[in-house]
Amino acid sequence: MVNIEKFIDQAVREIRDAAGEDKVVMALSGGVDSSVCAALATRAIGDQLVPIYVDTGLMRKGETDRIRSLFADANLRVVDAADEFFEALAGIVDPEEKRKAIGAKFIRIFEREAKRTGATMLLQGTIYPDRIESEGGIKSHHNVGGMPLDIEFKGVIEPLADLYKDEVREVAGGLGLPAEIQHRMPFPGPGLAVRVLGEVTKEKIAIVREANAIVEECLVEEFRPWQCFAALIGLGTGVKGDVRLHGWIVAVRAVGSRDGMTADPLLLPYETLSRMATRITAEIPGVARVVYDVTPKPPATIEYE
């Protein structure tokens, strides 16, 4: 159990000591991890912090507008890098290579922004499960195992690296962050790219973005899952009228968890599953089938890639 006040005081000191007089860039995604990092760093170094939101083109529906609004007073730099990420992911089908390509692109963008702002340090919202999965070979996280070795920063500051997700939420409460941030559902750093099996294209991302929005609309308020989402897992055969067609298969996943290290599928009512399937196939052209994933973690991970 983390002593919240003690942790906040210690993290503020560590950030201040690590940064010294240097400017620090950080990735602010709007999730609880990066938001807590931003709040701690603001206390520690004030205007030395340069928060950056990277629009990768792999974000949830309406995410960039939400971030602009939520952090309107934070002197946030917004970088439109969608074309860069799709170019970096072209032709890649292996999940591990995807994560590494995304991690490398993030670092190159932060290095570029650091040069523009005079920053020499990088602050990240890495948490303990990220380290466990990367170091254990389960999957590389874009901010740990997916990072390139040849970074140009003097150092990387990771004040949350020993905390689990539920502990980060407690720290968010201790910092007085809004409930919207404190209890926000986890979203992977690589974005929707890890919810597309196979090569990532703009067409596939557009489909999975709409499917994710429908899943969240159907489940978040009523069932309060730890995480829920849709993934594009392949092509299958369907029928429209009397005509056979090949369309996309969308898998829906909704789990309960405490810290993300283990998770159990939510046993959703059939009516809810049917409503989601009907909406996804009716509202998104090209989707022929919807399935619901009931695999716990372990043996599966929560995300598909």
Curated annotation (Swiss-Prot):
It comes from Methanoculleus marisnigri (strain ATCC 35101 / DSM 1498 / JR1). GO terms for cellular component: cytosol. It is an enzyme of class 6 (ligase). Heterodimer composed of a glutamine amidotransferase subunit (A) and a GMP-binding subunit (B). It comes from the Archaea. It catalyses: XMP + L-glutamine + ATP + H2O = GMP + L-glutamate + AMP + diphosphate + 2 H(+). Pfam families: GMP_synt_C, NAD_synthase. Disulfide bonds: none annotated. SUPFAM superfamilies: Adenine nucleotide alpha hydrolases-like, GMP synthetase C-terminal dimerisation domain. GO terms for molecular function: ATP binding; GMP synthase activity. CDD domains: GMP_synthase_C. This is GMP synthase [glutamine-hydrolyzing] subunit B. Keywords: ATP-binding, GMP biosynthesis, Ligase, Nucleotide-binding, Purine biosynthesis. ATP binds at S29, G30, G31, V32, D33, S34, S35.
